[in-house]
Amino acid sequence: MIPCRAALTFARCLIRRKIVTLDSLEDTKLCRCLSTMDLIALGVGSTLGAGVYVLAGEVAKADSGPSIVVSFLIAALASVMAGLCYAEFGARVPKTGSAYLYTYVTVGELWAFITGWNLILSYVIGTSSVARAWSGTFDELLSKQIGQFLRTYFRMNYTGLAEYPDFFAVCLILLLAGLLSFGVKESAWVNKVFTAVNILVLLFVMVAGFVKGNVANWKISEEFLKNISASAREPPSENGTSIYGAGGFMPYGFTGTLAGAATCFYAFVGFDCIATTGEEVRNPQKAIPIGIVTSLLVCFMAYFGVSAALTLMMPYYLLDEKSPLPVAFEYVGWGPAKYVVAAGSLCALSTSLLGSIFPMPRVIYAMAEDGLLFKCLAQINSKTKTPIIATLSSGAVAALMAFLFDLKALVDMMSIGTLMAYSLVAACVLILRYQPGLSYDQPKCSPEKDGLGSSPRVTSKSESQVTMLQRQGFSMRTLFCPSLLPTQQSASLVSFLVGFLAFLVLGLSVLTTYGVHAITRLEAWSLALLALFLVLFVAIVLTIWRQPQNQQKVAFMVPFLPFLPAFSILVNIYLMVQLSADTWVRFSIWMAIGFLIYFSYGIRHSLEGHLRDENNEEDAYPDNVHAAAEEKSAIQANDHHPRNLSSPFIFHEKTSEF
């Protein structure tokens, strides 16, 4: 009996959820100094990195041709689905932590730690790789003199390490980490300057492309491409067409456009850094959703315009995969424009680097504040109001990686952390919107201050009616003809269906990735399995759609629920399956290190665990409440609010201005 009780207690520790109360949304140790424009600049700068100067040429030449503009449109729509889920959580829970916090308040502590641990990895590798790219781009402007010097005098001949240590990248990371430690407002100002220069350069590229472009480059005939291939002595493709495709707007067909969209999806990664600023924004409930959606829109317009200008200036099959824009300008006779492009590329890399460094210490700070990482990492500088220990320590780790390692083999690990976070946030939105408690619990503030209250139909329900609905048992009738109000049974059903949906999507992704040849050959087993997966997917989504949602309103809510989050989960898991086996092995090693930290330290020092244990002790020994009051106040020193541990209630918008 005792081992079973211990196992049950251990399992409850893994799924305990963080309680975020209304008062704690304003309570922060950080400095609230960021505006909506600061968030837009941060999102655009982080997302619109150097990829806009390189990715368009690579995808247009190999996958999409001129239809790369459609590829970016599809990728933008897929990214917006994830962005909208982040936007709703940013409005509901405007606290530091991003996807880590959103997972913690919805599905529990273990999944939250997994999410946060992988976000840390993504930001560290992203910071290191962008710093080395910045160093390499600057070295190109100096005719590679820095690299030649370091290769001569500091060459490293060890497997897995870089060819030479990158001192320049180390200095760059430490400089920006120091800037962030100095203050968020100063960092935001520097970011806005670099982002503005980047946008101006991209506008120049678009205008120049449309002026010097030729629509004929979108209408190249197949015969012309065959002649080009024959003169270059290139063998034809398997279907008899040129290696450059069939010509026209979609030379590689719609499948090529979709393949390009999968690659372009990663060009929109980075907006999630906005969600880590919840405790540093003046009005986070409105600024975070606006910042996320606006930054994604601006980035799409930039990617769309640059890719259109590039393919109009130069035939897609002649594009240079590494430096498409400078080569394209030389092709149209504007050679000196390459210096403008180089300046824009350095500014883009600078904002991208700042966008990687900025959220990294904030996720670490949030996890340390909750007790899941070492408490010293939650220390806040009294003058600058920044997590100085987390900033400097994470910057030092990123600098060390940039100094020693060849990061090309590790970059794919960034994708796992990001895509997993996207998937979990979408799943959390589904689970949260069908919880029963959000409509019945009345916040301790007036409707006028609350801004958006519950609907009259819900608030007019008597307590006895609500209790009757909560006690309603499960049956097939409640599955297909549920009540008007969410119950605990309907919420549990949705939670189960969301989990089952994730495993179903995983199976569908594996089938369409590794069994695609069997599907194209119309083999019976593959078609039957594909049909089964699709039917179950549609049935589960429709069943979730039939369940009653809570009536609570916030500043921003994901539209088209549950279809949009479900499709976001499908896209993200499919892209995760595309990653190589070596990437998953490295990911497993990183997770093993994380689990060692969590099960040896985090699970025992969790703030939620201490507060729940204290609450249980008060229930068991009510006569000792006064004797334990002093200890309780010490534990709640960082909380400053009463807690309702029986409900995973997440408070809605509080429209006060900071």
Curated annotation (Swiss-Prot):
It is found in: Cell membrane. It is a multi-pass membrane protein. The modification Phosphothreonine is found at T28. One of its GO terms (biological process) is L-ornithine transmembrane transport. Residues 1-37, 85-104, 185-192, 270-289, 361-386, 432-490, 550-557, 604-658 are cytoplasmic. The modification Phosphoserine is found at S24, S446, S455, S464, S646, S647. Expressed at high levels in the skeletal muscle, placenta and ovary. Expressed at intermediate levels in the liver and pancreas and at low levels in the kidney and heart. The chain crosses the membrane at residues 38-59, 64-84, 105-125, 164-184, 193-213, 249-269, 290-309, 340-360, 387-407, 411-431, 491-511, 525-549, 558-578, 583-603. It comes from the Eukaryota. Keywords: Amino-acid transport, Cell membrane, Glycoprotein, Membrane, Phosphoprotein, Transmembrane, Transmembrane helix, Transport. Glycans are attached at N157, N227, N239. It catalyses: L-lysine(in) = L-lysine(out); L-ornithine(in) = L-ornithine(out). It holds the Pfam family AA_permease_C. One of its GO terms (cellular component) is plasma membrane. One of its GO terms (molecular function) is basic amino acid transmembrane transporter activity. Residues 60-63, 126-163, 214-248, 310-339, 408-410, 512-524, 579-582 are extracellular. Functions as a permease involved in the transport of the cationic amino acids (L-arginine, L-lysine, L-ornithine and L-homoarginine); the affinity for its substrates differs between isoforms created by alternative splicing. May play a role in classical or alternative activation of macrophages via its role in arginine transport. Belongs to the amino acid-polyamine-organocation (APC) superfamily. Cationic amino acid transporter (CAT) (TC 2.A.3.3) family. This is Cationic amino acid transporter 2. It comes from Homo sapiens (Human). The lineage of its organism: Eukaryota, Metazoa, Chordata, Craniata, Vertebrata. The gene is SLC7A2.
